[in-house]
Amino acid sequence: PGFIGTTGLDRYPESAWQGLKNVVRKAPINRHGTAAEISAAVVFLMSEMAAFITGIDLRVDGGIHHGRGGFLFKAKAGSSPPAFNGFHRDETAELLKD
């Protein structure tokens, strides 16, 4: 997945926090993902709705493709679709709380 704003980000040294906050500025979605958005993709793939799927490369990354060195789409200033926060145990990383 792309950069997900869970408490796992807090394990990085504080010297890296600013870079982790800013990494999404160039991404098409303009925000970090949520644990619920990752789990929603997993739930879909495990559901009857995906019964005819035999193989897939499903990128749940907000347009940030690791290892590619760039983005497929250009970010639009001020555009950010609302996050799906359907996972009741999700906690936002401290470094993203402002």
Regions found by a protein language model. Give the residues of each.
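PG/GG-rich flexible active-site loop of Rossmann-like NAD(P)H-dependent oxidoreductases
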Residues: 1-8, 27, 32, 59, ...
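A glycine/serine/threonine-rich, flexible loop-to-helix segment
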Residues: 3-26, 68-98
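Catalytic "switch" loops of ABC-type ATPases
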Residues: 5, 48-49
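Residue-level recognition of oxygen-bearing side chains
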Residues: 8, 37-40
